[in-house]
Regions:
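Basic nucleic-acid-binding interfaces
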Residues: 1-74
Length: 74
């Protein structure tokens, strides 16, 4: 399984759209993206990149494999 690298929030959103997610939409304290009935809460904008640990958790929740994620790399 490939090792992830940190990504910017903008890159995360663009790459999630490749997997069929729409959004981000405003909701509560965090924005979210949707794919069908699945809702994925995404981190708020901040200065740094999204850590490898958080990215791994988001991908697991979105049911996206590490191999598929790496294929969308620019």
């Amino acid at each position: 399984m490939p090792r992830h690298s940190p990504v910017s929030r903008r890159d995360l959103i663009q790459r999630l759209k490749v997997f069929g997610f729409t959004g981000p939409f405003i909701g509560g304290r965090h924005e979210f993206m949707e794919r069908g009935t699945q809702r994925l809460i995404i981190p708020n904008p901040h200065r740094g990149d999204i850590s490898v640990d958080l990215l791994s958790r988001l991908l697991r929740q979105a049911h996206i494999s590490a191999d598929d994620w790496e294929k969308t790399k620019n």
